[in-house]
Amino acid sequence: MVRYMVTAALPYANGPIHAGHLAGAYLPADIFVRYLRLKGEDVVFICGTDEHGTPISFRALNEKRSPREIVDEFHEHIKTAFQRVKISFDYFGRTELPVHYRLSQEFFLKALENGYLVKKVTKQAYCEHDKRFLPDRFVIGTCPYCGAENQRGDQCEVCGRPLTPEILIEPRCAFCKNPITFRESTHYYIKMQEFEEKLKEWIKEKDWKPNVKNMVLGWIEEGLEERAITRDLDWGIPVPLDEEDMKNKVLYVWFEAPIGYISLTIEYFKRIGKPNEWKKYWLNLDGQTRVIHFIGKDNIPFHAIFWPAFLMAYGKYKDEEVEAEWNLPYDIPANEYLTLEGKKFSTSRNWAIWIHEFLDVFPADYLRYYLTSIMPETRDSDFSFAEFKTKINEELVNVLGNFVYRALTFVNRYFDGIVPERGELDELDRQALEEIEKTFEEVGKLIREYRFKDALKKVMNLAGFGNRYFDYKEPWKTIKEDKTRTGTTINISLQIVKALGILLEPFLPDASEKIWHFLNLEEVKTWRFTELPAGHKVRKPEILFKKASDDQIIYFILNYMGRNNPDAARELLEKYYKLEDVEKVAIEKFGEEDGRFMLKKIFKEKYKGEKKGEQKMQYVSFEEFSKIDLRIGKIVEVQDHPNADKLYVVKVDLGGEIRTLVAGLKKYYKPEELLNRYVVIVANLEPKKLRGVESQGMLLAADDGEKVALLMPDKEVKLGAKVR
């Protein structure tokens, strides 16, 4: 039986993770693994924080803290963020574990023993001002390949090419910004050229994504050169040699980080009491293991060229039980880049969607759904707040959530929550059941091909089919004439609901669990669909998804982007919203004083910031005012708005005429406080649909910015009486 060793790129423990990281490596890996588990496959999903990279040292120096403090903080931060967004690692560890130190040093010594390392005296970047050697990331300059400025000395973020400080144009110290010099230093290099032909032949045989395979073969064709695997740095894994010129030197993180996949697997099986089980996944014992690395575009050369070379350089692993070659990567389904509103994510400018912040405002399933629907599988894609809102509301809420709620509400209302017997099937009924089977087959195939965006679309197509089936069958009509026919419709609708509960598990695990709960199922989900039996009792449903609102998006931009990067917040807010709408949210969420202070910080001179009551009075003529028809009415019914959290739908008696009004009073009045109240309404206001419900007038109320109070006559008067 094939077994899967699935990894996701080890995130640097120097800061939080953002939506670009999630869409690039972690969400696709999680979808793939969740599907394999549903299929009953043998799969282990491993990840952990990379805790020795120069980004950690860089942040520690900037913040005058120790690297240990930095990695301890962000290991927990990143781990929690992954848990909140429901990334289901079997184990999430860290490269500061002793097993990782031991294994990394072992890889170094084996490569040295096998003749693949060479010691060289070379010139290393050195800052005369700060009196220290500079790791590649501590050097910035212009990329010689694409001309991008302010690129680090290890890799160009624009074209993705590996770099060294020596080839940068006008290299400078990243801290003091002074030009650097180069001093002699002794280091070990791996002879990458010795693996060139073997790597080329190995990669040519792979059925990898074209964007990965073509990029890697292109680099190899240009020729591989010796690359340093030790460096002058005081934070990292010490070089395991008692040599004078190796004192105070550590293993290069790009050498030891991928070894973390193995060391973390060893740690995982040790913790679950199976200390030798890791060998089945990392050693080629029977040819049945598929090692799959999910990464972002910037990690392709390290995983597809250098990492396989390290495994080859080690040679055979041998202990008292086994002797075998290492498993080389079976597949590397790297994704391209995710941009934000047309621009590259920038952590330094806070031009990013940080996962922990986004989940403070929106559910995890919303982020998972949107990112999967735009996943940059073969080309770059863009995160747009407008598109996010549209996709959530028009697809997740109106299609998927609507169908599940309709089917479950109907069976509870007309069949006491009991799955009805199925009568004779017509052509559409049979087509519905065929759609279920076809969707499972197609979605599974697409997931195995790493086409997660198309797979999710197929799932949503089934939900859309369910809605169309329900509409065509019109059970709300047939229930009055033919309960048996209606029972068949509802039975099949519930089969689609159950199918969705399974199909959504890889993509939207929270929604999947809710559907399973609504269906009152205790069986373990599997990819093999079995029907709900007639007579099974289901629960009453709740709303599966609530609409994403402009207020939520404004709040997110204000509270998170606005605090650290006011210019970025202003750019987004001006792109989508009127200033008065932003002001309303700011004052509602942060209070009068703090809200206006925040708006002045973001909009500067564009925001005048008058408090309520301070605005200059604007007059209307008596003729204009006399056009307004104000009437006395009585509230006779109060209902929650079906599509909005802050609105009521109220019915007002104007004396022989009942008007339906939409009122934003939910925050200020309970339904029972409004019922039977006399109110003043604008009776000749043009009707307008508010969130799908037509409002035939407007209630009048006083608003001081904190409290809202309805205007009411101080004694009972005839309903419909004019206010003059």
From Swiss-Prot:
Binds 1 zinc ion per subunit. The keyword Zinc applies. GO terms for cellular component: cytosol. Its main location: cytoplasm. Transmembrane segments: none annotated. A motif ('HIGH' region) lies at residues 11-21. InterPro entries: aa-tRNA-synth_I_CS, Anticodon_Met, Met-tRNA-synth_bsu_C, Met-tRNA_ligase_1, Met-tRNA_synth, Methionyl/Leucyl_tRNA_Synth, MetRS_core, MetRS_Zn. Its EC number is 6.1.1.10. It catalyses: tRNA(Met) + L-methionine + ATP = L-methionyl-tRNA(Met) + AMP + diphosphate. It holds the Pfam family Anticodon_3. Keywords: Aminoacyl-tRNA synthetase, ATP-binding, Cytoplasm, Ligase, Metal-binding, Nucleotide-binding, Protein biosynthesis, RNA-binding, tRNA-binding, Zinc. A motif ('KMSKS' region) lies at residues 344-348. GO terms for molecular function: ATP binding; metal ion binding; methionine-tRNA ligase activity; tRNA binding. Belongs to the class-I aminoacyl-tRNA synthetase family. MetG type 1 subfamily. Homodimer. This is Methionine--tRNA ligase. It comes from Pyrococcus furiosus (strain ATCC 43587 / DSM 3638 / JCM 8422 / Vc1).
